[in-house]
Amino acid sequence: MPQLVPFYFLNQLVYGFALVTILLVLFAQYFLPQILRLYVSRLFISKL
């Protein structure tokens, strides 16, 4: 299994951290603000 060969550990760590960083930026910049706006607008509408 290639994931258990020590030569590939650094490659997997680099791609893993890169993927987590990209996902974190995408969620923080694009998806979560839209979800928050939707939640707040629904909250204000329900309080009327």
Swiss-Prot record:
Keyword match Ion transport: yes
Species name: Kluyveromyces lactis (strain ATCC 8585 / CBS 2359 / DSM 70799 / NBRC 1267 / NRRL Y-1140 / WM37) (Yeast)
Compartments where located: Mitochondrion membrane
Single GO term (MF): proton-transporting ATP synthase activity, rotational mechanism
Leader sequence residues: none
Name of the protein in question: ATP synthase protein 8
PANTHER family membership: ATP SYNTHASE PROTEIN 8 (PTHR36101:SF1)
Bilayer disposition of the protein: Single-pass membrane protein
Family annotation (Pfam families): Fun_ATP-synt_8
InterPro entries documented for this protein: ATP_synth_su8_fun
Main location: mitochondrion
Annotated keywords: ATP synthesis, CF(0), Hydrogen ion transport, Ion transport, Membrane, Mitochondrion, Transmembrane, Transmembrane helix, Transport
Highest taxon of the lineage: Eukaryota
Reported function: Mitochondrial membrane ATP synthase (F(1)F(0) ATP synthase or Complex V) produces ATP from ADP in the presence of a proton gradient across the membrane which is generated by electron transport complexes of the respiratory chain. F-type ATPases consist of two structural domains, F(1) - containing the extramembraneous catalytic core and F(0) - containing the membrane proton channel, linked together by a central stalk and a peripheral stalk. During catalysis, ATP synthesis in the catalytic domain of F(1) is coupled via a rotary mechanism of the central stalk subunits to proton translocation.
Subunit structure: F-type ATPases have 2 components, CF(1) - the catalytic core - and CF(0) - the membrane proton channel.
Residues spanning the membrane: 13-32
Family per similarity comment: Belongs to the ATPase protein 8 family.
One GO cellular component term: mitochondrial membrane
